[in-house]
């Protein structure tokens, strides 16, 4: 699995074994502007201020 790992979308990395999800975190007030991206094993929960989106395909975040 390859996930974007920087704020600029064309940079990505191969996820280590066991991390089979990509995630993107953004502020609820500006959901189109990511604040953090990367690989994870479980999807973090969204909060009142931060929206988290997880996916399972290459560069989907």
UniProtKB/Swiss-Prot annotation:
The keyword rRNA processing does not apply. It is found in: Secreted. GO terms for biological process: killing of cells of another organism; regulation of blood pressure. GO terms for cellular component: extracellular region. Disulfide bonds join 3-22, 15-39, 43-54, 55-60. The keyword DNA damage does not apply. Is classified as a P-type cytotoxin, since a proline residue stands at position 31 (Pro-31 in standard classification). This is Cytotoxin 3.
